[in-house]
Amino acid sequence: MDINMTLVGQLIAFVVFVIFCMKYVWPPIIGAIEDRQATIADGLAASDRAAKDLELAQEKATAQLKEAKVQAASIVDAAKKHEAKIVDEAAGKAQVEKERILASGHAEIETERNRAKEELRKEVAVLAIAGAEKILERSIDAAAHSDILDKLVAEL
């Protein structure tokens, strides 16, 4: 194989080309590749952080949901206690009102009974006088014998 000037020229051109590529072409390509690697690494790291953040957010949401359920249960319990208190108060008020109405009714009945007794006593006194008049066949003066009538009314 003959080594001639063409081969040497090609060798020199190739070396110059390689040096040129290493000096001017290769660094931007390597820089772009390294930038792309860094971007991908940052994206993967961000993805991992986002996954961890999502997991933390889900745990926090679960904890808040549990807390909300506990609060809701306590609110429901408080409402039930309040309801029971209101019902008890209403029942107490109704009982007091019932007792008042019953007492009023009993007092009214007692008053009416006493009035009826008085009317009956008066009627009995009148009937007794009428009966005595018929028996004695004479009229008894009611004013003169009021003591006798009062005793008779008291006995009835």
From Swiss-Prot:
Membrane topology (UniProt): Single-pass membrane protein
Protein name: ATP synthase subunit b
Gene name as annotated: atpF
Spans traversing the lipid bilayer: 11-31
Organism: Colwellia psychrerythraea (strain 34H / ATCC BAA-681)
One Gene Ontology molecular-function label: proton-transporting ATP synthase activity, rotational mechanism
UniProt-annotated location(s): Cell inner membrane
GO cellular component: plasma membrane; proton-transporting ATP synthase complex
NCBIfam families linked: ATP_synt_b (TIGR01144), PRK05759.1-2 (NF004411), PRK05759.1-4 (NF004413)
Predominant localisation class: membrane
Entry's family note: Belongs to the ATPase B chain family.
